[in-house]
Structures are given as C-alpha cells and as structure tokens.
A protein has these predicted regions:
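Short, solvent-exposed amphipathic alpha-helices that sit
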Residues: 17-28
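A short beta-strand-loop structural module common to alpha/beta enzyme folds
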Residues: 33-45
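Short, high-confidence coil segments that cap the C-terminus of an alpha-helix
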Residues: 32, 63-65, 106
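Helix-adjacent hinge/juxtasegments
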Residues: 51-91
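C-terminal binding/interaction regions
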Residues: 3-17, 95-155
C-alpha cells in the first residue's frame, strides 16, 4: 500500500484564489492523509516568505511530507522554502517537470504561479504530483545525497 501524504498548502494574496481551489482538491484526493493550510486568508497580506518558510519548516520538522505553495509566479515561494535546511522546492508548470521534481530531485515542495498558469493545469499538475514517490535506490538518489551533503557541511 502506498503511503498517503500529509500536505501543507499556503500562498500569499497573489495566490489565494488558486490556493483555495487546490486545497479542496487535495482534501478529496485519495493520496492525501491530511491538509494543513498555513495561510493566507481572504483578508491577509502576509508576505510570501513567511508562508513559504512556515510550510517548509513543517516538512523539516516531520509534521508534513509535502507542500504546495502558490504566489504570483511561484518563484518567490520556491526561493523562500529552499532557505529551510533539508527542503528542496521548485516551480513547475508542466507535467514533465512535476514528474522530475519528485523522481529525479526528491523535492518535497511544488510551487505554482497564479499569474503564470491556468487553474485547470494547476489542478492537473497537483493531482499528478501526488502520484510520484522518490525511489531511494534510483540513479538520482546519489545526486540528491550530494545536495544534502553540501547542505550539511559546516561553512
């Protein structure tokens, strides 16, 4: 049996509309155990780094398995999430990139830009993303280990 994911979702005000739609899909997905929303709400203007870092920290702390983050471009939340030790986040707006995000890079965080892709594509990509699981015995595992090794060096 495949493990279900504990997913955290978040956005800034530029991604709020998509976050709400995507959250509903995640909550009904059979690959999802739970969904935690770290903001924002309809009236908030929380800066995207706060939301992205909170979501990424939940993964780093073992409280979530994956995060889906949305801002205007998807780039700001990816950069912010990547500042949390142990997190690999990337923006992906096509099926192949979503697949490789997990299978080649073991990234836990997928980010979207509400101003970049349509909602139907975002829904499709989020659903696909939940079907992928990183294989620790794959050829990519050594490359991911090198990233982790560098991250853990005393600098």
């Amino acid at each position: 049996m495949t493990k279900k994911f504990r997913v955290v979702i978040g956005s800034d005000d530029a991604g709020f509309q998509y976050k709400e739609i995507l959250k509903k899909q995640l909550q009904s997905d059979t690959n999802v155990e739970s969904v935690v929303d770290v903001g924002v709400d309809a009236s908030s203007k929380t800066p995207y780094p706060d939301v992205a870092i909170a979501a990424a920290q939940m993964i780093a702390d073992g409280k979530a398995d994956r995060a889906l983050l949305i801002c205007g471009t998807g780039l700001g939340v990816a950069i912010s999430a990547n500042k949390v030790k142990g997190i690999r986040a990337a923006t992906a707006h096509d099926s192949y990139s979503v697949e490789r995000l997990v299978l080649s890079n073991n990234a836990q965080v997928l980010t979207f830009g509400q101003r970049v892709i349509g909602i139907e594509l975002a829904l499709r990509l989020a659903k696909e993303w939940l079907t992928y699981h990183f294989d620790e015995s794959s050829a990519s595992a050594q490359k991911v280990a090198l990233i982790t090794e560098f991250e853990n060096k005393d600098q």
